[in-house]
């Protein structure tokens, strides 16, 4: 910048001796025609050369800086390709680089200003005759150009500082992300190790559970087999008991069928007994003298009574067996008939005992009541 300023300062110094030239021109009007035209042209040409050299030097420096920036950008791009997860941050940096491209476009606009300046120089060469009036305008324009170049250089310094700061921030962010990624990878490795250990534990526990379940199933099968064997034995016993009960039922039915004719015989003998009792009552008065015969007859009657009692006991046993087997209503009818038979037997016993005591009259009255029944 100091060299640019030193190159820009000779401009007004070259223009300073012009008043002397004016005075000389006034003194020597003949020499003004050649020397007066040569000095402004050389000064302006030197100024234009100095400005072009300064601009070329600035552009060269900026091109070197931009080459460095491009190298750094390429390095950043290679690093960003390794970290695909940081595309968002790279997009931010690319947006910042686009802003730098805008600044480059502004620099190109400054170059277009240089072309305009050259056009102005050519116009100045045409208007050398009017240079006396346009010196102030030229100095003002030079000052404006110096200010513009100063502003451009300051802007480039700021942009370079911002880019350096951005690269430093990006490096720090890359380091942070790299550390975070490494931490995540380490945590993932630890989780994978813990999961593998858990899987091993689960496999061992499943094997143990399978063994225990197989043992329990075998024990359950043995228990079921034992229960089945015991159940089969119980079923066999029940079948045997059923067969015995069926045989007993057949025996009881046979006995019942064998006792039925005896009962019929008893029923058949009951009217004869009743007739005999009536005949005894009728001839009781005639038979008082024949007590021996009556005693014999009573003995026979007692024997017959014993037989009847035996028959009654057998009938009672049959009744008990019939109640256990629970036959139909025919058995109930037979029970009723047996009850009537028992009543008649008891009446006969009472009659025989009354006859012995000499109470035949009372017994006859009672017998009439039973006949009415």
Swiss-Prot record:
Residues 1-11 have a biased composition (Basic residues). N-glycosylated at Asn-151. GO terms for cellular component: endoplasmic reticulum; endoplasmic reticulum membrane. It is a single-pass membrane protein. It comes from the Eukaryota. Residues 86-257, 285-324 form a coiled coil. The chain crosses the membrane at residues 43-59. Keywords: Coiled coil, Endoplasmic reticulum, Glycoprotein, Membrane, Transmembrane, Transmembrane helix. Its main location: endoplasmic reticulum. GO terms for biological process: response to interleukin-1; response to lipopolysaccharide; response to tumor necrosis factor. The keyword Nucleotidyltransferase does not apply. Glycans are attached at residue 151. It is found in: Endoplasmic reticulum membrane. InterPro entries: Inh_kappa-B_kinase-int. Residues 18-33 have a biased composition (Basic and acidic residues). Residues 1-38 are annotated as: Disordered. Shares a common promoter with APAF1 from which the 2 genes are transcribed in opposite directions. Target of p53/TP53 with pro-apoptotic function. This is Inhibitor of nuclear factor kappa-B kinase-interacting protein. The lineage of its organism: Eukaryota, Metazoa, Chordata, Craniata, Vertebrata.
């Amino acid at each position: 910048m100091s060299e640019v300023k030193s190159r820009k300062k000779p401009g007004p110094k070259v223009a300073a001796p012009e008043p002397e030239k004016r005075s000389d021109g006034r003194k020597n009007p003949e020499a003004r025609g050649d020397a007066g035209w040569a000095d402004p042209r050389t000064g302006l040409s030197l100024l234009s050369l100095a400005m072009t050299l300064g601009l070329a030097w600035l552009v060269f420096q900026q091109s070197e800086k931009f080459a460095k920036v491009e190298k750094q950008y390429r390095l950043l791009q290679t690093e960003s390709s390794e970290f695909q997860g940081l595309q968002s941050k790279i997009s931010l940096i690319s947006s910042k680089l686009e802003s730098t491209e805008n600044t480059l476009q502004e620099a190109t606009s400054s170059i277009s200003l240089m072309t305009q300046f050259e056009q102005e120089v050519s116009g100045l060469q045409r208007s050398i005759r009017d240079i006396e009036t346009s010196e102030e305008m030229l100095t003002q324009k030079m000052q404006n150009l110096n200010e513009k170049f100063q502003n451009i250089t300051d802007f480039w310094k700021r942009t370079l500082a911002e880019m350096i700061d951005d690269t430093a921030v990006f490096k720090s962010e890359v380091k942070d992300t790299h550390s975070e990624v490494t931490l995540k990878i380490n945590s993932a490795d630890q989780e994978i190790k813990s999961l593998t250990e858990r899987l091993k534990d689960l496999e061992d526990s499943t094997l143990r559970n399978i063994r225990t379940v197989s043992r329990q199933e075998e024990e359950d099968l043995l228990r079921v087999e034992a229960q089945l064997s015991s159940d089969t034995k119980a079923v066999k016993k029940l079948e045997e008991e059923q067969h015995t009960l069926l045989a007993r039922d057949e025996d009881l039915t046979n006995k019942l069928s064998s006792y039925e004719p005896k009962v019929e015989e008893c029923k058949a003998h009951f009217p004869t007994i009743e007739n005999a009792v009536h005949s005894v009552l009728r001839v009781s008065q005639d038979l008082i003298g024949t007590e021996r015969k009556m005693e014999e007859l009573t003995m026979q009657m007692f024997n017959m009574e014993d037989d009847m009692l035996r028959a009654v006991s057998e009938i009672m046993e049959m009744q008990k067996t019939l109640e256990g087997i629970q036959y139909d209503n025919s058995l109930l009818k037979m029970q009723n008939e047996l009850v009537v038979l028992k009543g008649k037997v008891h009446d006969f016993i009472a009659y025989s005992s009354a006859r012995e005591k000499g109470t035949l009259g009372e017994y006859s009255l009672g017998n009439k009541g039973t006949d009415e029944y």
